[in-house]
Amino acid sequence: MEAIINKLYQQASLTEQESQQLFDTIIRGELDPILMASALTALKIKGETPDEIAGAAKALLANAQPFPRPDYDFADIVGTGGDGHNTINISTTAAFVAAACGLKVAKHGNRSVSSKSGSSDLLDSFGINLAMSAEDTRSAVDNIGVAFLFAPQYHSGVKHAMPVRQTMKTRTIFNILGPLINPARPNIELMGVYSQELVRPIAETMLKMGMKRAAVVHGSGLDEVAIHGDTLVAEIKDGVIHEYTLTPADFGVNTHPLEAIKGGDPEENKAIITHLLTGKGTEAQLSAVAVNVALLMRLFGHEDLKANTQQAIDVMNSGKAYQLVEKLAQHA
């Protein structure tokens, strides 16, 4: 371990294996907190490479509680958080809408670290059981089309890094690992990142982790597809990364100011999302969710973004997605 940390002190990059070894030690609670802080700081200042991120993610997945992985195509739709904009819970809402459009989604999330209301805060407010067993969660994906995996239940070892992270009060590699360590191991993923500098490296990381099809996005300051500006996309298809830019017009929607999709605390967000999923959402709110569902649908082979967007809007207006929220709340 000393050799690995010394390598970081010299601003040298670790191999995937070395990174996996380092994070394995962290997750098992075997690394001295001072050395852990030093390693996390050195990685941050140097800038984490796809090899280092993939190695860390593999270490966390190897130490996670097991999950009965489906053998069909299924996805996660998730943002790193930390974009500082406190928008409504777009990816969580999009998960239900995507399921109502016929996709399978196993969403991995946590309580909010930076925004007023993280995905689990919202689900909690709808009465959805966050401590659902792995078996019940799997049957929800099978039968309802959507389920939620609560990170602490599967990744108990992350607690060993918590005091160090809280004391450091700065972003570390852990801030980007969450979306990469879904214990269900989906083969399709739409991941939003808080900085456009992360788009390409995270796509390269996903390629190393064997994703079948995925897209990493940054939307003009947001960790999701934007309706207030351009969205930078790095999409993995057939083992190759394609980079392109999308505008609201590509989805057939109007441009809206960021203020139009501001969120609040869990109760306010619950009211907004309930309206959205029962046909009472504003045009901006409907568009914001629909463009994210549309890109996720593309990853399942539905290539027409405008048709996908319209289907997502129709599903929200029909109330079909809200029925899935209720079903998941009754599930277990």
UniProtKB/Swiss-Prot annotation:
GO cellular component: cytosol
Cofactor: Mg(2+)
EC number, as in UniProt: 2.4.2.18
Keyword check for Plastid: no
Pfam families: Glycos_trans_3N (PF02885), Glycos_transf_3 (PF00591)
A Gene Ontology BP annotation from the UniProt entry: L-tryptophan biosynthetic process
Residues bound to anthranilate 1: G79, N110
PANTHER family: ANTHRANILATE PHOSPHORIBOSYLTRANSFERASE
Protein name stated in the entry: Anthranilate phosphoribosyltransferase
Annotated organism of origin: Vibrio vulnificus (strain CMCP6)
